[in-house]
């Protein structure tokens, strides 16, 4: 247990092009073709949590007397390589590239169309 925690702390942070709040489309796996908003990114594991996708049920035991158990449904993480940025305006998926504009600000744009994201 302790070794796995140390390993995660010592592992390199992976640079992710997808950010929290982006609209993504699942391109691989059992949820293929579905779209959703990114709720959370986990850079150390290169994973993302997408709203309404990859749902898992969790059975929770009662913690106090008189309380009944519950069944919770929550989103599990997906590997970042299984999702792509989805443009709602153009209705396409595309890779993301970074560039620096004339003012020296780092921005993101779609590789297919050149549409600015940030």
Curated annotation (Swiss-Prot):
GO CC, sorted alphabetically, is: ribonucleoprotein complex; ribosome
Pfam families recorded for this chain? KOW, ribosomal_L24
Q: Which GO terms describe its biological process?
A: translation
Say if the entry is tagged with keyword RNA-binding.
Answer: yes
Query: InterPro entries from the xrefs?
Result: KOW, Rib_uL2_dom2, Ribosomal_uL24, Ribosomal_uL24_CS, Ribosomal_uL24_KOW, Translation_prot_SH3-like_sf
- Mind listing the UniProt keywords for this protein, alphabetically? Ribonucleoprotein, Ribosomal protein, RNA-binding, rRNA-binding
Molecular functions per Gene Ontology: rRNA binding; structural constituent of ribosome
Q: Which CDD domains match?
A: KOW_RPL26
| HAMAP family documented for this protein | Ribosomal_uL24_B (MF_01326_B)
Q: How does it assemble?
A: Part of the 50S ribosomal subunit.
PANTHER family registered for this protein in UniProt: MITOCHONDRIAL RIBOSOMAL PROTEIN L24
Family assignment? Answer: Belongs to the universal ribosomal protein uL24 family.
Reported function: One of two assembly initiator proteins, it binds directly to the 5'-end of the 23S rRNA, where it nucleates assembly of the 50S subunit. One of the proteins that surrounds the polypeptide exit tunnel on the outside of the subunit.
Please report the name of this protein according to its UniProt entry.
Answer: Large ribosomal subunit protein uL24
Q: Which organism is it from?
A: Prochlorococcus marinus (strain MIT 9515)
């Amino acid at each position: 247990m302790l070794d796995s925690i140390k390993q995660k702390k010592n592992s390199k942070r992976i640079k992710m092009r997808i950010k929290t709040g982006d609209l993504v489309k699942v391109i691989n796996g059992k949820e293929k073709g579905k779209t959703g908003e990114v709720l959370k990114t986990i850079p150390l594991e290169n994973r993302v949590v997408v709203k309404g996708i990859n749902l898992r049920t969790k059975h929770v035991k009662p913690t106090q007397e008189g309380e009944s158990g519950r069944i919770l449904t929550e989103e599990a993480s997906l590997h970042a390589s299984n999702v792509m940025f989805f443009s709602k305006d153009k209705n396409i998926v595309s890779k993301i590239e970074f560039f620096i504009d004339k003012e020296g600000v780092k921005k993101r744009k779609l590789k297919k169309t050149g549409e600015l994201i940030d």
